[in-house]
Structures are given as C-alpha cells and as structure tokens.
From Swiss-Prot:
Gene: ppc
Protein name: Phosphoenolpyruvate carboxylase
Cited Pfam families: PEPcase
Enzyme class, first EC level, given as a word: lyase
GO CC annotations, alphabetized: cytosol
Length: 878
C-alpha cells in the first residue's frame, strides 16, 4: 500500500486498539482474546492458509450463545470505525490525492489546452446545474445516534492531525476518542422501531443542518476562487448551481405510510427548519453589520435618515419576519388553526431582497470584503435552500392515477377509462385539460384510494410555489400516464405548472421511452404547457432487476441518447433524472467516470440524481466531504459538456446489442425461468430475515405474497450483497461479453474499453463488484443453509462468476482486479479481514435461527448486527 495511506492505516490501528480496550473493560479479557483470535485467523485465511480458514469456521460455529453478540458487535463496530477513518482520509491534508476529485483548476488548464475559449467555459459555468435528490431508501443501517458519534470521531482525527500539539492537548483528544468509542459500544446499533416517514424527513433535515448548510457556501467560495484564478470570472451572487430536493415525505410509491397528511406535515416541518437555520444566520449578521455608511436606496429601505445602523435595522426586520413565520408554522404543526401573519415568508424573494440590498450597498460603499463574508454565504443559502429548505418530489405509481380517473368516469356515466384505448384516453384527457369547467363533482364520495390521490394533488396545490419540485410517475408506460397527472393537478386547483416526470424503469419501458415522449411532444396543448422544458426519469435498479445489469445499462444509454436527440430536434431542454443507487460513487473515479459515461449532451440540461441511503452519509456527511463531492460533480459536468464523450461507432453499437441480448437471456434464464431459483435465493441469503430489520418506512415488497418480481430492487440487491455472491450486479454481463468474444469481437471490445467511457465504466464497475464478491463465502452459505438438492444451482452460479472474472480481466488486459484503482482495492482488502468473520457468523446464525421455531433473542440480535456489519464492510448495501 502506498505511503500516502500510512496515516489512514495508523488511524485505523489506533481506533481498533481503543475498541479493544473498551471491549476488555466491558466484557473481560477472554472476550477480547476470542475476538483477536478470530481476527488473526481471518487474516491468515485471507492470505491463503487453508488450515486457518477451517479453524476460523470451526471457531465461529462453536461460539456459545453468550459470545455471539459481543463477537458480532466487535467486528461490526470496527468496520464502522474503519469507514470513519477512511472518510477522514478523503479530506485530510495527508490523503486528499487519494480520493478527492481532480482539482477544478487542473480541469480548467486541461480545457484551455484543448483550445476551449474562456467564454465557452464561462457559459458552461453559468449553465451549471446540480440537483441532488435525497431519498430515504432503507440502506442507511447505522442509527442516527451512532452517526453523530462517528462524526465526532472524525472531528477528533482532524484535531490529532497537527504536528504542533502539546502533550496535554493530545491527551485531551485521546480521552474524548476513548469516550466516543465506549459510548458507541454501549449503544444498541440496531433500531428497535421502524422509522416513520416524518423520522426519515428529519434525518434529511439533519444532513442539511450538520453538513450541507456549511458545506455548500464553502464549496461555492472555493469554486469562485478557482474561477477567478483560472478564468478571471466571478460566480454571480444570484447563481444557483446547486439545489437539494428530497423524496422523504413525498415518495408514496408502494409506501402506504406516506399519505397526503404526511406530505403536508413534512412541507410545514421543512419550512420551520428553514426559519430556524436562517434565524441563526441573521442573528450573526445583526451582530456583524454595524456599519452606518450606506447608499441612499438602502437608507430609505431601512427607514430613513434617523436610522443610525441601517444594515442592522434591516437584519432585525428580517429576524422579526422569520420569528413570526416560525411561530405560525409551529402552531400549524401542532394542528392549531391560526391566521398567517401579514409578513409570512412564502417566497425566496422576500428573504433575498433585503439581504441583496445590503450586499449591493456594502460593495458600493467600498466594503466589499464585508459583503463577501457571512452575508454572501447567507445569500447563497437563500438561493440553494431558500424558504422551503429542501423541495419535495411527489412520486406515485401510474396505475393509481388510472384507477382514480376510471372510478370518476364510471361515476359520471362516461364508461370505464381503464378499458379505453390509449388514443381514446389521450383524446379525453386533452379535452378535459382544455375545458374551463371542473370534472370532479363536489358531492362525489370516491373510494379511500382515489380520495388519497386527489388529496395529495390538493396538498401540492396549496403548497407555496417552489416547495414541490416535481411529480414523478413510477412505472410510466404511455403518454396518458403523464396527461392524467396534469388533469388531476388541474382538478385540485393547482395554480402553477409543476414539472411532471415519467419514470421509465423496466427494459421494455426504457426501449419505448422515446416513442412515448415523441407522442407527448406532438400534442399542441402539452407543448404549450411545458414551455420548452421536460424532465424524464431513468430507473436504474428496477431495470437491472428486470433484465440484468448489462442489458439494463445499454437500454438506459439508448433511451437517454434517443430522448436527447428527440428533444433537441423539438427545441426542448431535457433534464434527465437518474434514479441511481449506492453503487455509483464509491470513491472519486467511479462517480466521475459514471457521469462521463453518459451519452453526449445528456448533462446539458443539468444533472438531477438521487442520493440514496448510506451514500448520503458517505458523500455529504461532513462539510469537508460535501465540498469534495460537489467539486467532483461540478468538474465532471463541466467536462462532459465542454469535452463530450465520442458518439459510439456503428460497430460498437452492434457489439453492445449482441452482448446485451445475450446477457439478458442468461440473466432471465436463471432469475425468471429456473423454477428452483426463488427457493435457492430465499435459502442462500438473509432475504426473509431482512424484513425484520427496522430500516425504512417502506415495506420491502410491493406485494407480500409475490416472488422476485414483487421484491423491491433494494432488498434484492441487499440480500445478495450479504452472502457475497453480489449476483444482481454481474449475472449475465460476463456471458454477454463471452458471446461477443466467441463472435470474434475481442479486439473491438478492447478498443471500446480504451476509447468509450460508457463501456470502460461498465467494465470498471464489474471489477469493483468482483473484488467484493467471494466464492468460498458464497459456497459456505450454501453448505450451511441450502438444501442439498439446490447445491448444483449454487455451484453453477459460482462457476459463472469465476468465468466472468476471467473474461473481464482479459478485456481490461489486467492481471488482477482493480489494477487502476489501487486505493479502492486496498480499502476492500483491509475490510475483508473484518467482514469475513461476520459473513461466516451470519451463515451460522441463520442456520441456528432457521432450526428454531422461536429463535433465541441473542441469536436474532446478533444476526441483525452481522447484517449491519456486512453492510458497513461492503460500503454499499442497495
């Protein structure tokens, strides 16, 4: 391992020692000895010692019930501490080259070398748009209380990272670290109760408060410095290159716990939190802006000549307005019926105008250094977060809208909307959208399901404009799916046009996406409504579950490419919204590469992407990490727009079509067509046990009685990650590549790997998955948990995995996996020593728990801890 990582290694070692001391103090030397024996056996086993491997298995199988939980917790907590040390390494002065994105300054130099003009680069900066959508997917296993402790551990590591510390200072920091490690050890790592949608929303607000509030203005300050140095250009104060939206409290797709009332509550809570955070900012400005010299315009705004401190007076006025707004929102949250104050804050302009007036006056009076301090940071927060704090997307499944309108047409005696042809549906919807009379009768009493859909639309209509970002339609298939939502919003009295984004997420729907949008854009009423802007969401996880990762990736690429060209031809600005999971963005290179691997022109309308579960913490959990992640995104988008990747050659497209079809066939031959597959999946993974983990507010299944197709994509991936077969992330891909090689295309594949970012990223992601997969552990799960009649199926899958690894290494022309990303390879290797015992123990615990009708509480608790620990070891769960 490179010398660069020695600081991280020593931090990991130090935290491990502190954890060991804590375990010894809490449970005695014998438990620590047992943990240490297991660790040494695991290390030796990883180095290839077969005797150590067998002894490791025997030791873990023979643990007494009293030892199960302490051993599981020891390895799980160590992995959490390792992740914390690694996260600190990414921002420490000793480690920034390891995982930070390429510096923006270097990017500008490279762009100039490519003969791009400063004006081109400035235009690209002006158009920069990054919208990150925080989602409460149940992949964040770690409890919030433990996250806070780990954040403080990070702070201690930062404090220790100074060579000039006096002994007493170092001792004080070490004492605090010991306390934090002990607090973590004595805290239950598994939640007792499933979080409600409101709890999830509060978790999202905590990310804003603890990290983004400071991190976003700090990034923009750094970004501005790079622009000044490289392009002699300043980021305009009013620029909004970054926005945050949330699905927490708005995503009702398959989650009956997210009701219209919940969305209304979360919208109020979000506005309340915004007033709380802005009040802190304004209080600082009241204290700082004591200057008296100002422009005549500002003096008049502040109340005339008799006001001695005009800036301070204006800030006090804003403070009063925020206080009144907060009191009103608080009363509403308590369910009280209150009249809004006359100065209620509902729009960003109300906050922006007095602050910006102060900014302009300070600059005009020669006090630019003051204007560009705390005041500028607050102005940028108004632009990024504003009065809503985070905007909310509402997401609902397409059939819920169809059912609602069908119930209405039956009531009105117009027939059954659901059974009409697509052209009849469109004609009816467009006619009603153009009509001035309401369609929904006042005295109609619909079913509870339809009432809920209508009430959600009313919540949107009542919300201040700008607090709802978009309405996303999952499982969108036809143009009428989009028109139906516009009609429901119209009937609710929505006074503004809300972006309605169809989400295409199965293989067939991705293939049809361009046809659907072409039809929609051909409707005059629709073209007039959208005012030249269209958002389309591309589903990643569901399409991969449907067709396998390689076929899904290619369908996503083709769909995006076709949509870009269709919208360009129609003069429409397209925003592609990427519904990705945690597998993008492990380390700088994959995230950077993933953005550059999209079709040319796909980022012209900006980047809109989901940030899911535990990835929010890894990428935005600390202000410094936020700066690094935003720099990575900004650099990748500028590069993709100014130096777009090449259009794929005709031969490359033909090869992708060939291997995509072959990979889909192979994937479905197992997942859909093998009658034993579901039984094997349920036995070989902790899929059924995962349902007991109180992770998120959303049920793990769309239908409780269904097979794989009814499983949500996240538990599907999560379960296979736990047993280290990682099946959804590779099955079919290697077989498709082999088919192309058999067709004589190996040289073409090598060229694609070298010259086409889309393809090289696919290969890179496969390598990372293969590095995390483990054949002997997957086999051990089979031996402990699976009926012997199903062993041949498990063996077939492992043989396929081994063959796929060889194929990918041959195409990448590498001797070993992750050769070009040694930092991530090293990180995985470091974790394996601690994750392997958790995997073995998990298989043992699953075996014990499945033998008993009512498993011992200690077995169940230890099992949940191993699931959390393996998730920490793998660094991406779903």
């Amino acid at each position: 391992m490179n010398e660069q990582y020695s600081a991280m290694r020593s931090n990991v070692s130090m935290l491990g020692t502190l954890l060991g001391d804590t375990i010894k103090e809490a449970l005695g030397e014998h438990i620590l000895d047992r943990v240490e024996t297991i660790r040494k056996l695991s290390k030796s086993s990883r180095a290839g010692n077969e005797a150590s491997r067998q002894e490791l298995l025997t030791t873990l199988q023979n643990l007494s019930n009293d030892e199960l939980l302490p051993v599981a917790r020891a390895f799980s907590q160590f992995l959490n501490l390792t992740n914390t040390a690694e996260q600190y390494h990414s921002i420490s002065p000793h480690g920034e080259a390891a995982s930070n994105p390429e510096a923006l300054a270097q990017l500008f130099t490279r762009l100039k070398d490519k003969k791009l003009s400063d004006q081109d680069m400035r235009s690209a900066v002006d158009d920069l748009s990054i919208e990150l959508v925080l989602t409460a997917h149940p992949t964040e296993i770690t409890r919030r209380t433990l996250i806070h402790k780990l954040v403080e551990v990070n702070t201690c590591l930062s404090q220790l990272d100074h060579n000039d510390l006096a002994d007493y200072e170092r001792n004080k920091i070490m004492r605090r670290l010991r306390q934090l490690v002990a607090q973590s050890w004595h805290t239950d790592e598994i939640r007792k109760l499933r979080p409600s949608p409101v709890d999830e929303a509060k978790w999202g607000f905590a990310v804003v408060e603890n990290s983004l509030w400071e991190g976003v203005p700090a990034f923009l300050r750094e970004f501005n410095e790079q622009l000044e140095n490289s392009l002699d250009y300043r980021l305009p104060v009013e620029a909004v290159p970054i926005r945050f939206t949330s699905w927490m409290g708005g995503d009702r797709d398959g989650n009956p716990n997210v009701t219209a009332e919940i969305t209304r509550h979360v919208l109020l809570l979000s506005r309340w939190k915004a007033t709380d955070l802005f009040l802190r900012d304004i209080q600082v400005l009241v204290s700082e802006l004591s200057m008296s010299e100002c422009t005549p315009e500002l003096r008049e705004l502040a109340g005339g000549e008799e006001v001695l401190e005009p800036y301070r007076q204006l800030m006090k006025n804003v403070r009063t307005q925020l206080t009144n707004t907060q009191a009103y929102l608080e009363a509403r949250l308590k369910g009280e019926r209150v009249l809004p104050p006359h100065d209620l804050l509902v729009s960003n302009d109300q906050l922006w105008e007095p602050l910006y007036a102060c900014y302009q006056s300070l600059k005009a009076c020669g006090m630019e250094i003051i204007a560009n301090g705390q005041l500028l940071d607050t102005l940028r927060r108004v632009r990024c977060f504003g009065v809503p704090l985070v905007r909310i997307d509402v997401r609902q499944e397409s059939t819920r809208h169809t059912d609602a309108i069908a119930e209405l047409t039956r009531y009105l005696g117009l027939g059954d909307y659901e059974s009409w042809s697509e052209s009849d549906k469109q004609a009816f919807l467009v006619r009603e959208l153009n009509s001035k009379r309401p369609l929904v009768p006042l005295k109609w009493e619909p079913s509870a399901e339809t009432q809920e859909v209508l009430e959600t639309c009313r919540v949107i209509a009542e919300a201040p404009q700008g607090s709802i970002a978009a309405y996303v339609i999952s499982m969108a298939k036809v143009p009428s799916d989009v028109l139906a939502v516009h009609l429901l919003l119209k009937e609710a009295g929505c006074p503004f046009t809300l972006p309605v984004a169809p989400l295409f997420e199965t293989l067939d729907d991705l293939n049809n996406a361009d046809d659907v949008m072409t039809q929609l854009l051909g409707i005059d009423w629709y073209r007039g409504l959208i005012q030249g802007k269209q958002m389309v969401m591309i589903g990643y996880s569901d399409s991969a579950k449907d067709a396998g990762v390689m076929a899904a990736s290619w369908a996503q690429y083709r769909a995006q490419d076709a949509l870009i060209k269709t919208c360009e031809k129609a003069g429409i600005t397209l925003t592609l919204f990427h519904g990705r999971g945690g597998s993008i963005g492990r380390g700088g290179a994959p995230a950077h590469a993933a953005l550059l691997s999209q079709p040319p022109g796909s980022l012209k309308g900006g980047l809109r992407v989901t940030e899911q579960g535990e990835m929010i913490r890894f990428k935005f959990g600390l202000p410094e990490v936020t700066i690094s992640s935003l720099a990575l995104y900004a650099g990748a988008i500028l590069e993709a727009n100014l130096l777009p990747p090449p259009e794929p050659k005709k031969e490359w497209i033909e090869v992708m079509d060939l291997l995509s079809d072959a990979s889909c066939d192979m994937y479905r031959s197992y997942v859909r067509e093998n009658p034993e597959f579901v039984r094997y999946f349920r036995a070989a993974t902790p899929e059924l046990e995962l349902g007991k983990l109180p992770l998120g507010s959303r049920p793990a299944k769309r239908r409780p009685d269904g097979g794989v197709e009814s499983l949500r994509a996240i538990p599907w991936i999560f379960a296979w990650t736990q047993n280290r077969l990682m099946l959804p992330a590779w099955l079919g891909a290697g077989a498709g590549l082999q088919r192309a090689i058999d067709a004589g295309k190996q040289d073409v594949l090598a060229t694609m790997c070298r010259d086409w970012p889309f393809f090289s990223t696919r290969i890179g992601m496969l390598e990372m998955v293969f590095a995390k997969a483990d054949l002997w552990l997957a086999e051990y799960y089979d031996q402990r948990l699976v009926d012997k009649s199903l062993w041949p199926l498990g063996q077939q899958l492992r043989d396929q995995l081994a063959a796929d690894i060889k194929v990918v290494l041959a195409i990448a022309n590498d001797d070993h996996l992750m050769a070009d990303l040694p930092w991530i390879a090293e990180s995985i290797a470091l974790r394996n020593v601690y994750t392997d015992p958790l995997n073995v123990l998990q298989a043992e615990l699953l075996h014990r728990s499945r033998q008993q009708e009512h498993p011992d509480a200690c077995v169940e608790q230890a099992l949940m801890v191993t699931i959390a620990g393996v998730a920490a070891g793998m660094r991406n769960t779903g």
